C-alpha cells in the first residue's frame, strides 16, 4: 500500500515525511477493518480508499488558511483525519451526530496518536465553539445553502472561511448565495486516478 500511496503523491506533487505516510496507511487499514462491521464508507477496496479518501482529502491542504478548523459531518473522518495527519501544526474538530462514527474516530485517534484533533458527537446547529474557527470544512455534507444556514455561527467573523468540497462546479448553488456571503474562489482540484471532477468552494462572510 505504501508503494501505491507514494505513486499517487508523486503524481499529485505532494511530498510527505514517512511518519505521515505511515499514519495515512494506518488510517486506511483501520477504516477497512471497521468498515466490515460499521459500514462507514461505500468504498470497500483499500487501494481505492487511498485515491477517493486520502488523496481526495489532502489536495485541499494548500488552500486552507488558519490553524483552527472544524470538519462538519465528518463521517468516518473525511477530510478531517487525513488533513490532521498532514497538517500537525493545526487543530481540527471533527463533528458527527452518529455515535458509531465517533467511536471509530476515537480508535483512530488512539492508535495513530493524533493529538491535534477533538471529537464531538453533536448536530452541527447545536454545537458552539469559543473561540470560533478559522475554517469550516465540509465534504459531501449538504448544499451550500444548508451548510451556510447550519454552520453560520462557527467561523470567526469576518476572516473565517467556509470550505466546501464538491464534485462538479455547483453553479446553481453559487447563483443563490445569501447577500452576506462572498464567493472568494472556486478551485478545480486534481486528484490522481479519480474519475469525475472535484472543486473546492471557498466562501466568507461579507
Curated annotation (Swiss-Prot):
InterPro entries: rRNA_ssu_MeTfrase_G (IPR003682), SAM-dependent_MTases_sf (IPR029063). Keywords: Cytoplasm, Methyltransferase, rRNA processing, S-adenosyl-L-methionine, Transferase. Disulfide bonds: none annotated. One of its GO terms (cellular component) is cytosol. The keyword Repressor does not apply. S-adenosyl-L-methionine binds at residues 73, 78, 124-125, 139. It is found in: Cytoplasm. It catalyses: guanosine(527) in 16S rRNA + S-adenosyl-L-methionine = N(7)-methylguanosine(527) in 16S rRNA + S-adenosyl-L-homocysteine. Its EC number is 2.1.1.170. Its main location: cytoplasm. Specifically methylates the N7 position of guanine in position 527 of 16S rRNA. PANTHER family: S-ADENOSYL-L-METHIONINE-DEPENDENT METHYLTRANSFERASES SUPERFAMILY PROTEIN (PTHR31760:SF0). NCBIfam families: rsmG_gidB (TIGR00138). This is Ribosomal RNA small subunit methyltransferase G. It comes from Yersinia pseudotuberculosis serotype O:3 (strain YPIII).
Amino acid at each position: 500500500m505504501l508503494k501505491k500511496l507514494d505513486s499517487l503523491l508523486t503524481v499529485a506533487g505532494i511530498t510527505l515525511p514517512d511518519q505521515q505516510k505511515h499514519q495515512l496507511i494506518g488510517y486506511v487499514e483501520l477504516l477497512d477493518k471497521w468498515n466490515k462491521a460499521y459500514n462507514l464508507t461505500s468504498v470497500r477496496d483499500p487501494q481505492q480508499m487511498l485515491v477517493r479518501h486520502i488523496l481526495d482529502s489532502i489536495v485541499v491542504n494548500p488552500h486552507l488558511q488558519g490553524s483552527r478548523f472544524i470538519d462538519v459531518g465528518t463521517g468516518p473522518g473525511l477530510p478531517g483525519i487525513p488533513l490532521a495527519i498532514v497538517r500537525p501544526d493545526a487543530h481540527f474538530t471533527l463533528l458527527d451526530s452518529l455515535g458509531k462514527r465517533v467511536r471509530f474516530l476515537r480508535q483512530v485517534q488512539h492508535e495513530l496518536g493524533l493529538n491535534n484533533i477533538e471529537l464531538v458527537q453533536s448536530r452541527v446547529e447545536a454545537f458552539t465553539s469559543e473561540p470560533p474557527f478559522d475554517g469550516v470544512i465540509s465534504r459531501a455534507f449538504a448544499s451550500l445553502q444548508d451548510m451556510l444556514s447550519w454552520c453560520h455561527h462557527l467561523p470567526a467573523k469576518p476572516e473565517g472561511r467556509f470550505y466546501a468540497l464538491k464534485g462538479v462546479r455547483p453553479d446553481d448553488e453559487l447563483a443563490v448565495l445569501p447577500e452576506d456571503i462572498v464567493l472568494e474562489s472556486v478551485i478545480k482540484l486534481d486528484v490522481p486516478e479519480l474519475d469525475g471532477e472535484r472543486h473546492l468552494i471557498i466562501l466568507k462572510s461579507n
